[in-house]
Amino acid sequence: SDDELCADAPHSTEEVEAYEAARIENRAFWERKAAEDPQGLESEIIHALIGDRPLHPSQREVLEHLRAGRNTLAVMATGRGKSLTFQVHAALLALAQRKASVFVYPLRALIADQAFHLSETLEGFGIAVSVLTGESTPEERRQVMAELTDGSCDIVLTTPEFLAYHADKLARCGRIGFAVIDEAHHIGLAKAGQR
């Protein structure tokens, strides 16, 4: 429930500061791991996201293409782990190169769900996840843009409309190294003039 989620959030200034200090400490540990053992880091991230299950060959292939810096279109059946591949790559970029990623989703409900799960899963690595949609207040937008610029935000989840309107602001932060359009088949299903 929302009450349970809010109960776990830090409330006092001291709690917020302690949380941020722990995030920075975790981040430093995993950045060292990225420099010393990138394959080990990738395994740790995969384990955090899916446990002990092995990757499918198609997932390994997508990750190899992304690692090589290739633009990649991944078409897989539902439940075959497309999201896992780009989430792993984004986490690796954040820790190894301090690059941020933008994930574009067709629905705000999907953004909310993914943001919750990604934040919960990746916080142990010191990776920060934010949301920018048409529902974001001007202050929230300014804060996320500032965090993108200063390196304290690593992954932004947004909608096609927000991206189209604010792409220049996102680009000006200078840290975007990876962009993903999830559920891209919805683009062709939208009304004329949209998406």
Question: What residue spans do the PLM features occupy?
Answer:
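Hydrophobic positions in the central parallel beta-sheet of the AAA+
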Residues: 74, 103, 130, 156-158, ...
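Membrane-integral, polyisoprenol-dependent glycosyltransferases
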Residues: 55, 79, 158-159
